[in-house]
């Protein structure tokens, strides 16, 4: 039971950090369009997560990070290291449901993330690959011109959520 809980937390951490990677450089080239900033970094963030670039991903978490599980930035970094060591390969498949900006320096992302040990080409492969499916609600903050994850919550998802 403890191992299962730790594995679920690891999935959550990796996926959260993936989302952070998506938005981390958003301030550089498209300063006037935050939504375009978030969307333009999807491929870059996926690459960082799949290539296990832990240092890059860790830099994308706010020092003020906290979540409903009582985790802070240090706890997330520790879990991330464990997850990256435990999994030989990581492949992600994402669907953004919504990006909202309640304030100029705050963003809320609602997205679906599937994780598997093999590449996921489309929604039809999710069941065959037995991918772990999650829905994430992530709050981002722009700190000194860079987007960082401030809070993230997740729950299990169904294949239909990806359609």
Give short role names for the model-derived ranges.
Residues 104-163:
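Exposed beta-sheet edge and beta->alpha loop/turn motif
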Residues 1-10:
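N-terminal secretory signal peptides that target proteins for export/translocation
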Residues 58-116:
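Short solvent-exposed beta->alpha transition segments
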Residues 24-60:
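Short, low-complexity N-terminal intrinsically disordered segments enriched in polar/charged residues
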Residues 31-38, 50, 69-73, 89, ...:
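Solvent-exposed, acidic/flexible segments
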